[in-house]
Amino acid sequence: MSSTQDEAILRNARETIDSLYDLSQLLQTGLDKSTLSICVGMIEQGANPDTLAAVIKELRSENEALNSQSNA
């Protein structure tokens, strides 16, 4: 692949992540661009989106519980 093609692929990927991030912000998911990129990559590799969402929710819940314990 030529460098021009590589640049076009990278630009397209950035634009896609930017669009997904904008949508993520509208939906108030709380995901930053880095986390969103990781999630997209995992889904592209075959991860189940519903399962991934459940894991993220569980991790957030556990994090909140730990923060509550440390603040008590």
UniProtKB/Swiss-Prot annotation:
Keywords: Cytoplasm, Cytoskeleton. It comes from the Eukaryota. It is found in: Cytoplasm, Cytoskeleton, Microtubule organizing center, Spindle pole body. GO terms for cellular component: cytoplasm; gamma-tubulin complex; gamma-tubulin ring complex; interphase microtubule organizing center; mitotic spindle pole body; spindle. The keyword Amino-acid biosynthesis does not apply. Its main location: cytoplasm. The keyword Cytoplasm applies. GO terms for biological process: gamma-tubulin complex localization; microtubule nucleation by interphase microtubule organizing center; mitotic spindle assembly. Part of the gamma-tubulin complex. Required for gamma-tubulin complex recruitment to the microtubule organizing center (MTOC). Belongs to the MOZART1 family. This is Mitotic-spindle organizing protein 1. It comes from Cryptococcus neoformans var. neoformans serotype D (strain JEC21 / ATCC MYA-565) (Filobasidiella neoformans).
